[in-house]
Amino acid sequence: MKVLILACLVALALARELEELNVPGEIVESLSSSEESITRINKKIEKFQSEEQQQTEDELQDKIHPFAQTQSLVYPFPGPIPNSLPQNIPPLTQTPVVVPPFLQPEVMGVSKVKEAMAPKHKEMPFPKYPVEPFTESQSLTLTDVENLHLPLPLLQSWMHQPHQPLPPTVMFPPQSVLSLSQSKVLPVPQKAVPYPQRDMPIQAFLLYQEPVLGPVRGPFPIIV
């Protein structure tokens, strides 16, 4: 009886060992199958990615080079282009060459004849007369007075008349100045005396002056 029990126990132990050995084999098979499926999936993913990348590259090339595709040249007329021009075209008009007048000898001769017949007017220079400068400090002497041919009584009155000082100026109050400025002032007629020119001698200037009976205060003093 004991031998049978031991035999049964041994058989059970062997069966368990066999079961344990079969489980890792299945796991290995399952793992190998899963690895194959993973590799297949990776290959599909890589293929899809490569296709997408190539498509994007093609789109970029189409955007960068829109006219990269070959286009057929279309001519407006089917016949060949002639290399020679048609003979119906009129010849080009040539402009006549105009010779300037100064190159022709006949025109030069006519111009010389005209110049000989009508000579150019030459401007005559004005003669420059010597001008004696006249200064205000110049004074009359007795010989100059005698050469003027003035009457003797007028000359004696000029010679014997003493020099009189100028009258003192009168100061007016401010009210009188205002009254004079407000009143209408009538113009006083004065005799026009010709202004002595520089080129005019003294004798000619004194001939224009009229004899004055009163005291004479001329611009030129008489030296005795």
Swiss-Prot record:
Signal peptide residues on this chain, from the entry's feature table: 1-15
Name assigned to this protein: Beta-casein
GO terms for cellular component: extracellular space; Golgi apparatus; Golgi lumen
Protein source organism: Bos taurus
MF terms in GO: antioxidant activity; cysteine-type endopeptidase inhibitor activity; metal ion binding; potassium channel inhibitor activity; protein homodimerization activity
Cited function: Important role in determination of the surface properties of the casein micelles. Casoparan acts as a macrophage activator, increasing the phagocytic activity of macrophages and peroxide release from macrophages. It also acts as a bradykinin-potentiating peptide.
Lineage: Eukaryota, Metazoa, Chordata, Craniata, Vertebrata
Protein's UniProt keywords contain Signal: yes
Primary subcellular site in the record, as a coarse category: secreted
Similarity comment text for this entry: Belongs to the beta-casein family.
